[in-house]
């Protein structure tokens, strides 16, 4: 008997499988392979019938009022309370009392007896300030007959006003001392500016005395001396050295405060400007101070030459 080839073996296996499938054993064999043959679980979903205990323990909802409303063509939803209108009695509130109560709550000084007295807490505070405004330090303490307005602004405005209280103090003695300190700093600033101005004037006048003779004195002929350009070179060199030194000086000196237009704008609206742009504007204000000083020095030179040309000396 000859051995079967591989193709014949595969053919016999296919025929056996077809015979098994034709006998209906394919589904059982598939379940055996997938492991579902020994599963005891049922695919039917049992329906749960309510027990007697559940029906007896359930809370019965009142339906008599609901049926009455439905029969009377009422909307049952209208009986549900609105959280937004809770506590609203239908009367229009007084706007002044509403604003005063909002300020009192934000300041944390609610006075339950203020409504009984007829005067809100906020109004009493302002009236006390006005009553004590003519005595003492403009009503800055209890001794002056009023209250400290910084305390009021701090309670209403928050941390930004608190910085002002830290700067000026909370007691009359601290306020008076800090006022004197601020006035002293302003005086020192003015003295410093005066010294800088004197130094500039001395340098410019000395330069004009030494080099100004060689410069032309006539504004009509516009003639120049042979070494007249040396004055401008020395003047610009000294200005460059002076302006550079002054820039580093005013950057490190806290007592020096400039009165430029940019600084005034920063003092007014600095809180609304981002920190990056605020630093750039502060640097620009220093350059503006230097530019104004240079223009002032140049104007002195022009005025001196104009006077010499006019009087011809």
Curated annotation (Swiss-Prot):
It is found in: Endoplasmic reticulum membrane; Golgi apparatus membrane. Residues 1-191, 251-289 are cytoplasmic. GO terms for biological process: protein insertion into ER membrane; retrograde vesicle-mediated transport, Golgi to endoplasmic reticulum. Keywords: Endoplasmic reticulum, ER-Golgi transport, Golgi apparatus, Membrane, Transmembrane, Transmembrane helix, Transport. GO terms for cellular component: endoplasmic reticulum membrane; GET complex; Golgi membrane. The keyword Membrane applies. It is a multi-pass membrane protein. The keyword RNA-binding does not apply. Residues 52-63 have a biased composition (Low complexity). It comes from Komagataella phaffii (strain GS115 / ATCC 20864). Component of the Golgi to ER traffic (GET) complex, which is composed of GET1, GET2 and GET3. Within the complex, GET1 and GET2 form a heterotetramer which is stabilized by phosphatidylinositol binding and which binds to the GET3 homodimer. Residues 35-45 have a biased composition (Polar residues). Belongs to the GET2 family. This is Golgi to ER traffic protein 2. Required for the post-translational delivery of tail-anchored (TA) proteins to the endoplasmic reticulum. Together with GET1, acts as a membrane receptor for soluble GET3, which recognizes and selectively binds the transmembrane domain of TA proteins in the cytosol. The GET complex cooperates with the HDEL receptor ERD2 to mediate the ATP-dependent retrieval of resident ER proteins that contain a C-terminal H-D-E-L retention signal from the Golgi to the ER. Residues 15-78 are annotated as: Disordered. Residues 213-230, 311-313 are lumenal. The chain crosses the membrane at residues 192-212, 231-250, 290-310. Pfam families: GET2. It comes from the Eukaryota.
């Amino acid at each position: 008997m000859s051995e079967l080839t591989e193709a014949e073996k595969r053919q016999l296996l296919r025929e056996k499988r077809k015979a098994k499938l034709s006998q209906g054993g394919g589904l059982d064999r598939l379940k055996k392979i997938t492991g579902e043959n020994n599963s005891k679980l049922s695919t039917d979903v049992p329906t749960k019938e309510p027990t007697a205990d559940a029906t007896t323990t359930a809370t019965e909802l009142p339906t008599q009022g609901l049926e009455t409303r439905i029969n009377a063509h009422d909307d049952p939803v209208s009986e549900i309370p609105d959280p937004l209108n809770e506590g609203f009695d239908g009367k229009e509130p007084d706007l002044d009392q509403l604003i005063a109560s909002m300020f009192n709550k934000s300041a944390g000084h609610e006075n339950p007896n203020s409504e009984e007295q007829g005067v809100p807490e906020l109004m009493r505070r302002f009236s006390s300030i006005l009553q004590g405004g003519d005595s003492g330090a403009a009503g800055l303490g209890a001794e002056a007959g009023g209250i400290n307005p910084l305390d009021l602004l701090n309670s209403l405005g928050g941390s930004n006003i608190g910085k002002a209280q830290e700067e000026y103090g909370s007691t009359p003695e601290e306020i008076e001392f800090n006022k004197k300190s601020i006035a002293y700093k302003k005086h020192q600033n003015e003295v410093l500016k005066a010294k800088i101005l004197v130094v500039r004037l001395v340098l410019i006048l000395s330069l004009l005395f030494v080099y100004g003779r060689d410069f032309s004195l006539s504004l009509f002929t516009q003639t120049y001396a042979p070494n007249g350009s040396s004055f401008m070179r020395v003047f610009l060199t000294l200005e460059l050295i002076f302006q550079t030194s002054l820039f580093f000086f005013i950057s490190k000196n806290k007592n020096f405060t400039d009165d430029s237009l940019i600084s005034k704008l920063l003092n007014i609206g600095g809180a609304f400007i981002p920190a990056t742009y605020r630093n750039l504007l502060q640097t620009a204000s220093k350059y503006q101070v230097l530019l104004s000083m240079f223009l002032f020095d140049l104007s002195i030179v022009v005025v001196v030459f104009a006077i010499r040309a006019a009087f011809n000396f």
